[in-house]
Design a protein with these regions (language model features):
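Charge-dense, helix-prone N-terminal extensions
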Residues: 1-116
């Protein structure tokens, strides 16, 4: 038997602001073009043709994992990992609508283009 998960499953017992942040994030990504939400057991993958980001929900914030083809040096990055020669994952904490700013939008647009 295969377990299936929904986006809503990830917001059970979470602050309502976390869902609002997620919805704003999805709207931001949709300014670049279509995306698909792919809920997994522990995260929600956001895909174009391939995954461009992943979202882990926490009690009162989101942990956003952005894919890139280069290292991003920035204090907002709470964790960075080089997963292959030309692939990096960068985790960013999203705690308020102010965190969904132009800088983050630039990183997400790069990830969107990369996932083509």
């Amino acid at each position: 038997m295969v377990d299936t998960y929904t986006v809503n499953d990830h917001f059970i017992n979470k602050d309502a602001s976390v869902r609002a942040l997620y919805d704003q994030l999805v709207l931001l990504l949709q300014t670049f073009g279509p995306i698909q939400e792919d809920p997994k057991k522990t995260s929600i993958h956001l895909n174009r043709k391939s995954a461009l980001a992943g979202v882990e929900t926490r009690k009162d914030y989101l942990l956003l994992n952005i894919k890139s083809n280069h290292a991003i040096q920035n204090p907002r990055i709470v964790k960075a990992e080089q997963v292959s020669a030309k692939r990096f994952h960068h985790k960013v904490r999203i705690s308020s609508p102010n965190d969904l700013d132009e800088e983050l939008k630039t990183w997400l647009e790069e990830a969107y283009i990369l996932s083509e």
